[in-house]
């Protein structure tokens, strides 16, 4: 059997891989309006997926959206003002770029640590350390 024939046969027998090539996906925000308040229903699952403290993510959201808010007893975020899911998702994406993904290798295997008052992002995959905007 020729090499090209074997290669063609192998390609035919190889199953298709479904899904994305990325292993890190942030859940889409589940948003609803209650009057002039935006409720972020799945905030806790987003934070756990990001591997970050609720308060840190909340502080970023408040600053980025220019509003006030709080985390209620059910773990939902209640933001003052009307924000659609697209705007919340864009803000979470900014958070991920700044505080979750490694600037060197792009992997989410990072931890936040303070050193001499500065907040650093330390990558457990490649060992890189980078400063954050905070």
Swiss-Prot record:
* Entry superkingdom: Archaea
Q: Which Pfam families match?
A: eIF-5_eIF-2B
Q: Please explain the role this protein plays, according to its UniProt record.
A: eIF-2 functions in the early steps of protein synthesis by forming a ternary complex with GTP and initiator tRNA.
User: What's the subunit arrangement here?
Assistant: Heterotrimer composed of an alpha, a beta and a gamma chain.
* InterPro entries from the UniProt entry: IF2/IF5, TIF2_bsu_arc, Transl_init_fac_IF2/IF5_dom, Transl_init_fac_IF2/IF5_N, Transl_init_fac_IF2/IF5_Zn-bd
- Mind telling me which SMART domains this protein's record contains? eIF2B_5 (SM00653)
The root-end lineage is: Archaea, Methanobacteriati, Methanobacteriota, Stenosarchaea group, Halobacteria
Q: Residue spans with biased composition (Basic and acidic residues)?
A: 1-12
Keywords carried by this UniProt record: Initiation factor, Protein biosynthesis
Gene symbol here is: eif2b
Q: Which family does it belong to?
A: Belongs to the eIF-2-beta/eIF-5 family.
Q: What is this protein called?
A: Translation initiation factor 2 subunit beta
| Keyword Protein biosynthesis recorded | yes
Q: Protein biosynthesis: present as a keyword of the record?
A: yes
GO molecular function terms noted in the UniProt entry: translation initiation factor activity
Q: Sorted alphabetically, which PANTHER family does this protein's record hold?
A: EUKARYOTIC TRANSLATION INITIATION FACTOR, EUKARYOTIC TRANSLATION INITIATION FACTOR 2 SUBUNIT 2
What organism is recorded for this protein? Haloarcula marismortui (strain ATCC 43049 / DSM 3752 / JCM 8966 / VKM B-1809) (Halobacterium marismortui)
Q: Where is this region: Disordered?
A: 1-28
């Amino acid at each position: 059997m020729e090499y090209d024939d074997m290669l063609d046969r192998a390609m035919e027998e190889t199953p298709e891989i479904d899904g994305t090539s990325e292993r890190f996906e942030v859940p889409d925000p589940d948003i609803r309006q209650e009057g002039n308040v935006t409720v972020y229903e799945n905030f806790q699952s987003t934070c756990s997926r990001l591997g970050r403290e609720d308060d840190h993510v909340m502080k970023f959201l408040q600053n980025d959206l220019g509003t006030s808010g709080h985390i209620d007893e059910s773990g939902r975020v209640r933001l003052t003002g009307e924000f659609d899911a697209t705007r919340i998702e864009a803000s979470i994406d900014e958070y991920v770029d700044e505080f979750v993904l490694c600037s060197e290798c792009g992997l989410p295997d990072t931890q936040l640590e303070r050193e001499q008052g500065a907040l650093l992002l330390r990558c457990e995959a490649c060992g890189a350390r980078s400063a954050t905007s905070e």
